[in-house]
């Protein structure tokens, strides 16, 4: 596929051999976004872990201080009082076997799934459908809980789940290019802080090896790891 003129222009603005400060990197990403839609800003972090070993797995979640700039559709598997709690908190879809049946028929019009622990037997029936889509509730990221009100609020506020991939890389959205630079900065630092706090004790050597940031359609911009790390509180 030929490289578009706009992408070529964006690529020309980025020095791929350079590592930019967080401030300059964010400005560059905002300036190289060229799509007609409001692009998402994504961060990729290469970690010094080998996820093939269970004791080096990095997985968790973080509530970004400035959200993601999008409406997150939340589904909750719950019954009784917890069903009411989920609805009162603003969940978009709440139910049990009825939702399982819908999903078995191919319905996936939601972004996050939460379940109370007593519902996991029911949810397990559709694990093979939810898992590959990253929608399976998991206690490690706070989506299997009796505190459904809090879980719904966090998801609606911009909770991002992260999980290290085979190559030791974590990908996560941190907002929109339309965000103020300071808001993107705060979100990126919150993500990096969460990654640092999730460092496995078995990880040796340099933990955060590389950080890059990009818009949905734009080029990747390498960040100076030491500059970013020095700003993490």
Curated annotation (Swiss-Prot):
List the Pfam families hit by this protein, alphabetically.
Ribosomal_L1
Q: What CDD domains would the database entry show?
A: Ribosomal_L1
Which SUPFAM superfamilies does this entry report, sorted A to Z? Ribosomal protein L1
Entry keyword Transmembrane helix: no
| Annotated GO MF terms | rRNA binding; structural constituent of ribosome; tRNA binding
Superkingdom of source: Bacteria
Q: Name one GO biological process term.
A: regulation of translation
GO cellular-component terms in the record? cytosolic large ribosomal subunit
- Which family is it part of? Belongs to the universal ribosomal protein uL1 family.
Its function, per the record, reads: Binds directly to 23S rRNA. The L1 stalk is quite mobile in the ribosome, and is involved in E site tRNA release.
- Protein name (database record): Large ribosomal subunit protein uL1
Source organism of the structure: Geotalea uraniireducens (strain Rf4)
Q: Which gene encodes it?
A: rplA
């Amino acid at each position: 596929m030929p490289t578009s003129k706009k992408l070529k222009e964006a690529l020309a603005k980025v020095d791929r051999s350079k590592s930019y400060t967080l401030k300059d990197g964010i400005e560059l990403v905002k300036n190289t976004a060229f799509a007609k839609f409001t692009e998402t800003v994504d961060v990729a972090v290469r970690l010094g872990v080998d996820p093939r070993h269970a004791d080096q797995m990095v997985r968790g979640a973080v509530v970004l201080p400035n959200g993601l700039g999008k409406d997150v559709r939340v589904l909750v598997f719950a019954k009784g009082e917890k069903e009411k709690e989920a609805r009162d908190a603003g969940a978009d879809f709440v139910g049990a076997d009825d939702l399982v049946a819908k999903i078995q028929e191919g319905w996936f019009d939601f972004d996050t799934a939460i379940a109370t622990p007593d519902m996991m037997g029911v949810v397990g029936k559709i694990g093979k459908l939810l898992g590959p889509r990253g929608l399976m509730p998991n206690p490690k990221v706070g989506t299997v809980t009796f505190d459904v009100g809090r879980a719904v609020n966090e998801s609606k506020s911009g909770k991002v789940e992260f999980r290290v991939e085979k190559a030791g890389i974590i990908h996560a959205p941190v907002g929109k290019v339309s965000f103020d630079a300071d808001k993107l900065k705060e979100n990126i630092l919150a993500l990096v802080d969460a990654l640092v706090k999730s460092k496995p004790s078995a990880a040796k050597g340099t933990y955060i090896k590389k950080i890059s940031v990009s818009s949905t359609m734009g080029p990747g911009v390498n960040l100076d790891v030491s500059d970013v790390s020095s700003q993490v509180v």
